[in-house]
Design a protein with these regions (language model features):
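Membrane-interfacial loop-to-helix junctions in multi-pass transporters
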Residues: 1-7, 34-44, 123-131, 212-221, ...
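Hydrophobic alpha-helical transmembrane segments of multipass membrane transporters and ion channels
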Residues: 4, 85-93, 219-227, 256, ...
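Hydrophobic alpha-helical segments of integral membrane proteins
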Residues: 30-33, 50, 68, 72-76, ...
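Central hydrophobic cores of alpha-helical transmembrane segments
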Residues: 25-29, 48, 150-158
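Hydrophobic core segments of alpha-helical transmembrane domains in multi-pass membrane transport
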Residues: 5-13, 89-102, 129-143, 152-166, ...
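Hydrophobic alpha-helical transmembrane segments of multi-pass integral membrane proteins
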Residues: 1-29, 223-231, 237-285
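Transmembrane helical segments that form the transport core of multi-pass membrane transport proteins
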Residues: 145-264
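Membrane-core helix-loop-helix motifs of multi-pass transport proteins
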Residues: 31-134, 138, 293-367
Length: 367
């Protein structure tokens, strides 16, 4: 069922905090299964993108979630709480549409997954005990554990379970010239930090079982640092104030302020081609304006996520759009219409602003 793609990707994305990781792992597998079932690649790709970004938005481990909260100067979990008000309706509409699509369009293909299942069983020791690691991470997320602590615990538990339950994988990846303890340590460090690939008889599984580790995230980290420096420089020279003044002259009421913020995020995603730059610059640009209107900062952080984070995957030349289309092997043009959650989110935040639903005020300024 097509909606199952959304649910699976949502769970993985919440647990990992990364839409990119979700696409590069289960996303690839789901697209492969979809092709075997002769389901349009764009439909499966759209479901993967929708689920991945739903989880990315609500995960306290997500880089964009932390960035939007930090730029808007909002407590992380308060930011996530306010995100649910617009995010849950958006994903609900998406699921309903995919259920309807599933009823009206049945798959004509037939796939035999026994080869993939047997390959996985022959490669790994599969046990329900292995679910302990993601369950503990999810519990820590629910308990509002700081992201770094949750990531550290998840990493250490994953390493321990790898030693206990997957010794054959460690032996395969290790240098046999070293002692078992040293070899295991080296494999675990390499897995956490750099590229590791587990070879099987299936090309789909080979892609699924490949990882870039922490080094694979360095480009993203450098990009975030660069955007923060750029945003700070723009603020220091007064450029943000000049641009925001021109925009704010048009935003003479609360709805227009929200609309201007959404427009700014979309424009930066289109021109700067990066969601981090869109979040940082728009956040700094409208922070004072929201305060002057007597609006709590969580309104701004939510709007940044609803318009900057999710729409980045809908633009072919944006870093997110280019990445997802490349990894999934599905062009943005193919999955755009099916990534319903992503393009409905900006409209949802505008509807809430127009109807003044869940718009928290500071209570100290004129409304």
């Amino acid at each position: 069922k097509r909606q199952a793609c959304i649910i699976i990707c949502s769970i993985i994305s919440v647990a990992t905090g990364s839409s990119w990781t979700t696409s590069a792992t289960v996303g690839i597998a789901l697209v492969g299964i979809g092709k075997a079932l002769e389901i349009p690649a764009g439909m499966v790709g759209g479901a993967v993108i929708a689920g991945a970004y739903f989880g990315d938005k609500l995960s306290p481990l997500s880089d964009t979630t932390n960035l939007a909260a930090a730029v808007s100067k909002v407590d992380l979990f308060k930011h996530i709480k306010y995100l649910t008000y617009t995010t849950i309706p958006s994903i609900s509409i998406t699921l309903i549409v995919f259920i309807i699509l599933g009823i009206n369009q049945s798959s004509s293909g037939v796939t035999d997954n026994s080869f993939l299942i047997n390959t996985i069983e022959n490669t790994f020791n599969i046990s329900l005990i292995l679910f302990i690691v993601p369950i503990i991470v999810l519990i820590m997320i629910v308990k509002k554990t700081p992201p770094i602590k949750a990531l550290t615990v998840g990493t250490l538990l994953g390493a321990l379970f790898a030693i206990l339950f997957q010794p054959q994988i460690i032996n395969e990846l290790s240098d046999s010239s070293n002692s078992s303890i040293i070899a295991s340590y080296k494999v675990l460090i390499d897995t956490i930090t750099s590229d590791v690939s587990i070879t099987t008889e299936s090309e789909i599984l080979n892609e699924l079982f490949s990882t870039g580790g922490m080094i694979g995230m360095l480009n993203t980290i450098f990009l975030v640092m660069a955007t923060m420096i750029f945003g700070g420089s723009m603020d220091a020279i007064g450029a943000i104030k000049s641009i925001s003044k021109a925009l704010l002259n048009l935003a003479d009421n609360i709805f227009k302020l929200f609309a201007s913020t959404v427009a700014s995020c979309l424009a930066l995603n289109l021109t700067a081609s990066d969601q981090y730059l869109s979040i940082v610059v728009s956040g700094k640009m409208f922070e004072k304006a929201f305060e002057d209107k007597g609006l709590a900062p969580e309104n701004l952080s939510r709007t940044l996520e609803d318009s900057a984070t999710v729409t980045s995957a809908l633009i072919p030349w944006n870093s997110c759009g280019a990445y997802h289309s490349s990894v999934l092997g599905v062009s943005v043009g193919e999955y755009f219409i099916y990534a319903i959650f992503n393009w409905i989110s900006p409209f949802m935040t505008l509807i809430y602003a127009a109807l003044r639903i869940k718009i928290r005020t500071l209570g100290i300024k004129n409304q």
